[in-house]
A protein has these predicted regions:
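N-terminal subdomain of nucleotide-sugar transferases
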Residues: 1-46
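Short, glycine-rich nucleotide/cofactor-binding loops
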Residues: 13-23, 212-224
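Active-site and donor-binding regions of nucleotide-sugar-utilizing enzymes
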Residues: 14-17, 22-29, 56, 68-168
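Structural beta-sheet core signal
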Residues: 15, 41-43, 101, 123, ...
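A nucleotide-sugar donor-handling region in carbohydrate enzymes
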Residues: 46-51, 70, 147-222
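N-terminal beta-loop-helix "entrance" segment that forms/cooperates
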Residues: 47-63
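Short hydrophobic signal-anchor/transmembrane segments that target glycosyltransferases
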Residues: 222-238
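Catalytic donor nucleotide-activated moiety binding site of glycosyltransferases and closely related
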Residues: 239-251
Length: 251
């Protein structure tokens, strides 16, 4: 475990990430917390090792995490257990005054350990609902929303969902999405990107697809059907389809 020097001059905040979308969405929030709080960044490693995520930290100019849990297990239950166990060890060491999490992946379940330790939980992207318990994230988001101290929603619809479920209005704040700040901050870098040239593409003349959900890619038959559909789309519109291959899909 890392050696950490703890001071008392600023509020001590822990932010936990575990997936690449979380890293992207929180990139500017992390920068602000680094400036104004005593901030510790934790990566669960729930899906892949740090090296597979390192490109995102480098591209987004985010510092390396202070802690890396390496929580990936042989199945979802083992991973969730590891996430909670390792988070509790880190919370015991750091004694944070607040926890920030975003979204509904298994990394958000560190909130269970935080709740046990009475650490205030701030949950960004709260209140999203699909009303389908076959979706693992639907279970996660219901748990996390209901144990968080402050739920930060992207929309009025998400806020209404939480109110209907009985959460107090004074614990729900509509903030909007952090992607506005992310896109504004990186717009020059995006504009100067050479990716289209590298892939021999013309702007607005291609389809971009990313598929990683287990219900789409874990079944060879369903994945084959998806690929066949993409081929039909490409042939119909005479445009290439670029598939951003998620490690889960590649495997």
């Amino acid at each position: 475990m890392n050696t950490i020097n703890i001071s008392n001059s600023k509020i001590r905040v822990v932010t936990v990430v575990g997936t690449r979308p979380e890293i992207i969405r929180l990139s500017r929030v992390i920068a602000v917390l680094d400036e104004y709080t005593e901030h510790f960044l934790v990566h669960t490693g729930q899906n892949y090792d740090y090296e597979l995520n390192e490109v995102f930290f480098n591209e987004l100019e985010i510092r390396k995490p202070d802690f890396f849990m390496n929580a990936a297990g042989q199945n979802a239950a083992e991973t969730i257990g590891n996430v909670i166990i390792e988070a509790d060890k880190i919370f015991d060491k750091l004694q944070p005054e607040a926890l920030l999490i975003l979204g509904d992946t298994n990394s958000a379940l560190v909130s269970i350990a935080a709740k046990r330790r009475k650490i205030p939980i701030f949950h960004m992207e709260a209140g999203n609902r699909c009303f389908d318990y076959r979706v693992p994230e639907e279970i996660n988001r219901k748990i996390v929303d209901h144990i968080s101290d402050i739920n930060l929603t992207y929309s009025e619809i998400a806020r209404d969902y939480l109110l209907r479920e009985g959460l107090p209005a004074d614990q729900i704040i509509k903030t909007g999405s952090p992607m506005r700040e992310v896109l504004n901050f990186y717009k020059d870098k995006i504009s100067s990107s050479s990716i289209l040239e590298k892939l021999n593409l013309q702007a607005s003349s291609y389809f971009l697809v990313s598929s990683h959900r287990e219900e789409n890619v874990d079944s060879p038959e369903k994945l084959r059907s998806l690929i066949e559909t993409l081929n039909i789309v490409s042939e119909k519109y005479k445009l290439p389809v670029i598939v951003s291959t998620h490690p889960r899909t590649r495997n």
